């Protein structure tokens, strides 16, 4: 089966979030299952530098001007790059300028991505033609609309990684990006007078997937649906909405082989994990002690991630005898609040603003608990990394967090299924109660080690997800 993934990021070449991790791992896992899989991406500078050896497939006139489609390989995966320097050759983020303003021509930049995917399905490359086009998030949503407009030359799957990002643009652009005027309606891609690239994917795809079973249920409800819940309820009733849990790329995230760590370890040699803890405490300016558990945050600093709750719960966490290590960037108010906390609680709170892939490995390996108190979380990868590294996740019961972490309640400790700490209500008091339960387990080292070893033995590899997606493709 020939499958084309259409997306805007690819780990490790270009990453702004978990989307890049997924697309960096899923195609390889599907190839291992016997599929013929390629990826299409905009020709952003980081991607072109990372895939320098490409050949010209075709030059073609488009609504965005003359464009070249190039083909190369990255880590054994066939990659199509759309070479359109006027659209994509910009430094920094692929989505916004240095002032964090979204590029005014994003509607054109990402319409071209969907348009080129459709052209490939129509035979643009005479040597390879996809049977399934798998589009990811709003950036690729129009691929499904273009395929529908062209009579569906390939089947389409649209994966929602985060429904909150919808790709909304003026309806005046519809003619320019060469989509039928008839598509601009409620039963189409129109959303409150605008074009929604996300809705285009949801409406026109043959099947919609999300990145966890619980999130697939949540987004059919007004609290999580961002206005799309009616359409998603319809897709669910039609059997066209599925939640498939993301996986962890064990080639990158494995404490036994991770060369970014100060000391590699496994479930039977957890003393070496303590070496990473000491290095983390030193690096973050924390008191060096084995007695205090380190609670870590590795995240975008946004309200969605529930990090305002962490700030509210911080005095209790420290009073109980914990430390906090934070790595992330995002909302300026949250950044300043965490930096102020580091100044107020010197030696007990360490904060590094920004995102550094290597340091994210070291902080997850060195910490004892990874905090993921999200208001909503489509899947979440950080808690999966925590499980793999024996850094017990403390999470809110939502989305993929609910699907992957089992609370250390007495009955779960008794039957050996416990893998972390889970709370339900979205408030600081509930978070503090979960933190207190973490300290109770911490005070019983034998039980803590037992839960660590169980967590590290859980299998969240990509093989299961890859097989599930291929099974879905065959049913289309």
From Swiss-Prot:
GO biological process: glycogen biosynthetic process
Single Gene Ontology MF annotation: alpha-1,4-glucan glucosyltransferase (ADP-glucose donor) activity
Residues binding ADP-alpha-D-glucose: 15
Entries under InterPro entries matching the protein: Glyco_trans_1, GS/SS, Starch_synth_cat_dom
Catalysed reactions listed for this entry: [(1->4)-alpha-D-glucosyl](n) + ADP-alpha-D-glucose = [(1->4)-alpha-D-glucosyl](n+1) + ADP + H(+)
Swiss-Prot/TrEMBL keywords: Glycogen biosynthesis, Glycosyltransferase, Transferase
Top-tier EC class: transferase
One Pfam family matching this protein: Glycos_transf_1
GO cellular component terms, A-Z: cytosol
Domain of life: Bacteria
EC number: 2.4.1.21
Metabolic or biological pathway: Glycan biosynthesis; glycogen biosynthesis
Keyword Glycosyltransferase appears in the UniProt entry: yes
Protein's job: Synthesizes alpha-1,4-glucan chains using ADP-glucose.
Record-stated family: Belongs to the glycosyltransferase 1 family. Bacterial/plant glycogen synthase subfamily.
Protein name: Glycogen synthase
Species per Swiss-Prot/TrEMBL record: Yersinia enterocolitica serotype O:8 / biotype 1B (strain NCTC 13174 / 8081)
Gene name of the encoded protein: glgA
């Amino acid at each position: 089966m020939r499958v084309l993934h259409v997306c805007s990021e690819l780990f490790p070449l270009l990453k702004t979030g978990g989307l890049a991790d997924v697309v960096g791992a899923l195609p390889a896992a599907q190839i291992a299952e016997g599929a013929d899989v390629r990826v299409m991406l905009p020709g952003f500078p980081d991607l072109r530098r990372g895939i320098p050896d490409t050949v010209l497939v075709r030059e073609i006139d488009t609504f965005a001007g003359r464009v070249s489609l190039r083909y190369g390989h990255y880590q054994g995966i066939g990659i199509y790059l759309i070479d359109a320097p006027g659209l994509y050759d910009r430094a920094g983020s692929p989505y916004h300028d240095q002032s964090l303003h979204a590029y005014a021509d994003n509607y054109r930049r990402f319409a071209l991505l969907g348009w080129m995917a459709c052209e490939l399905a129509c035979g643009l490359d005479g040597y390879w033609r996809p049977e399934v086009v798998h589009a990811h998030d709003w950036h690729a949503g129009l691929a499904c609309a273009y395929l529908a407009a062209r009579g569906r030359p390939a089947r389409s799957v649209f994966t929602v990684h985060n429904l909150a990002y919808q790709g909304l643009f003026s309806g005046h652009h519809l003619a320019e990006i060469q989509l039928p005027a008839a598509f601009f309606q409620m039963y189409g891609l129109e959303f409150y007078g605008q074009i929604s690239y996300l809705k285009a994917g949801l409406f026109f795809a043959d099947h919609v997937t999300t990145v966890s079973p619980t999130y697939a249920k949540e987004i059919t409800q007004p609290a999580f649906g961002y206005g799309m819940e009616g359409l998603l309820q319809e897709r669910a009733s039609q059997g066209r909405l599925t939640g498939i849990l993301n996986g962890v790329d064990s080639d990158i995230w494995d404490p036994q082989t991770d060369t970014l760590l100060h000391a590699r370890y496994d479930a039977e040699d957890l003393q070496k994990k303590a070496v990473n803890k000491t290095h983390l405490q030193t690096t973050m300016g924390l008191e060096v002690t084995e007695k205090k558990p380190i609670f870590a945050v590795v995240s975008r600093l946004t309200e969605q991630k529930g990090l305002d709750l962490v700030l509210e719960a911080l005095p209790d966490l420290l009073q109980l005898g914990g430390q906090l290590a934070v790595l992330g960037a995002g909302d300026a108010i949250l950044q300043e609040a965490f930096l102020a906390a580091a100044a107020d609680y010197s030696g007990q709170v360490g904060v590094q603003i920004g995102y550094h892939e290597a340091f994210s490995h070291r902080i997850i390996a060195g910490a004892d608990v990874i905090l993921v108190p999200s208001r909503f979380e489509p899947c979440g990868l950080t808690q999966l990394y925590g499980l793999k590294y024996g850094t017990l996740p403390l999470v809110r019961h939502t989305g993929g967090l609910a699907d992957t972490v089992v609370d250390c309640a007495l009955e779960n400790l008794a039957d050996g299924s416990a893998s972390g700490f889970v709370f339900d209500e979205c408030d600081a008091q509930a978070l503090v109660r979960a933190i207190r339960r973490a300290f109770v387990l911490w005070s019983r080292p034998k039980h803590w080690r037992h839960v660590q070893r169980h967590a590290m033995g859980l299998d969240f590899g990509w093989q299961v997800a890859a097989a599930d997606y291929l099974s879905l493709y065959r049913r289309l």
